[in-house]
């Protein structure tokens, strides 16, 4: 066959495999023809601890051999020098013990830096005097390199200093989420004042500002209707009571159920849906055991909305006798 030059591969132990003070490094000389090859280490200056194994003829007819050397694990990298006279080839390969370092995740590429979101108070909080409405400003994708975030709050463009201390949360993707909460008065929200959160962070070229206020427009009073379960449902273990709420504006509304003055929790509310006339409607479905409905328990749908008298109304429903 034609003479063929060898390929040379460095051999080094994996990181963590060698707690001992000596480490074995090697070179694999593969796929050459004809014999022989010579292997020296550090141009022949390193002879101590060298073992060069006999060549092996592979099924392809080409030859391979390996040479190893034992060195102290702290020593400099070593070089194997491979010569193949038949093809006039000389190859030098440097082999180094791999150093162990604790693997670290690369920091996520936070392109564009942090983002800011502002959230309105919960409708129930703005409508009940006993509760405190809050506007919330959330900053996400804050990097660990620039973790400091400053919040400045404004009501109708006048700075206020009544925000709670910011809360910081380390996220799983090694970014930080920072939340600032501003307690506000019921009146400031209901009268449509504008709340602004201004966020400073080193990773931002300029501060980010987000504003929020109640939807503008004439408030419209919700109409509330309750409906019992369809007859076909009475054979199931539980039945659905429906509270339909129609014609309200703005869309901020709170809907809950109770039975005998105690809260019922097993309900779901659809989001408020924009109707063709510009008002909103929604449905709320309460699931109750059929037995409670059949024995005549009274269920009450309670609605809170700013256009209602005292911000509150309720509608009750129970099984009428004979059904």
Swiss-Prot record:
Pfam families per UniProt: C1-set
Variant or mutagenesis effect after changing residue 104 to M: In D11 marker
PROSITE patterns: IG_LIKE (PS50835), IG_MHC (PS00290)
Molecular-function GO term, any one: immunoglobulin receptor binding
Transmembrane helix is among the record's keywords: no
Disulfide bonds: none
InterPro entries per record: Ig-like_dom, Ig-like_dom_sf, Ig-like_fold, Ig/MHC_CS, Ig_C1-set, Immune_Resp_Modulators
Repeat recorded as keyword: yes
Protein origin, superkingdom: Eukaryota
Reported effect, residue 185 to A: In E15 marker
Sorted UniProt keywords: Immunoglobulin domain, Repeat
Domain Ig-like, first and last residues per copy: 6-96, 114-213, 222-318
Gene3D superfamilies: Immunoglobulins
PANTHER family (UniProt xref): TAPASIN
Extra remark beyond the main annotation: PubMed:6313520 sequence has the D12 allotypic marker, 104-Thr, and the E14 marker, 185-Thr. PubMed:6193512 has the D11 and E15 markers and Ref.5 the E15 marker.
This protein's name: Ig gamma chain C region
């Amino acid at each position: 066959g034609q003479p063929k030059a060898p390929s040379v591969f460095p051999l080094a132990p994996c990181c963590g495999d060698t707690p001992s003070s000596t480490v074995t490094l090697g070179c694999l000389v593969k796929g050459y023809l004809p014999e022989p090859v010579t292997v020296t280490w550090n141009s022949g200056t390193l002879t101590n601890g060298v073992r060069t194994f006999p060549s092996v003829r592979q099924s392809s007819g080409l030859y391979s051999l390996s040479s190893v050397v034992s060195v102290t694990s702290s020593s400099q990298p070593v070089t194997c020098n491979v010569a193949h006279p038949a093809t006039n080839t000389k190859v030098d390969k440097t082999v180094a013990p791999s150093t162990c370092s604790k693997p670290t995740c690369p920091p996520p590429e936070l392109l564009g830096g942090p983002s800011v979101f502002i959230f309105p108070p919960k409708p129930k909080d703005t409508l009940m005097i006993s509760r405190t409405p809050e506007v919330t400003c959330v900053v996400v994708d804050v990097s660990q390199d620039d973790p400091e975030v400053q919040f400045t709050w404004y009501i109708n463009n006048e700075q206020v200093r009544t925000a709670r201390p910011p809360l910081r949360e380390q996220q799983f993707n090694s970014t930080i989420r920072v939340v600032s909460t501003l307690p506000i008065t019921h009146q400031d929200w209901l009268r449509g004042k504008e709340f602004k959160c201004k966020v400073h962070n080193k990773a931002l070229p300029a501060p980010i500002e987000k504003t929020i206020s109640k939807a503008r427009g004439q408030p419209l009073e919700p109409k509330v209707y309750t409906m019992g379960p369809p007859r076909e449902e009475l054979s199931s273990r539980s039945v659905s009571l429906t509270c339909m709420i129609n014609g309200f504006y703005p869309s901020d509304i709170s809907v809950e159920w109770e039975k005998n003055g105690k809260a019922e929790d097993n309900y779901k509310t659809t989001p408020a849906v924009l109707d063709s006339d510009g008002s909103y409607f929604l449905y709320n479905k309460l699931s109750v055991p059929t037995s409670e409905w059949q024995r005549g328990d009274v269920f009450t749908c309670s609605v809170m909305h700013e256009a209602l008298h005292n911000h509150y109304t309720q509608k009750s429903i129970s099984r009428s006798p004979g059904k």
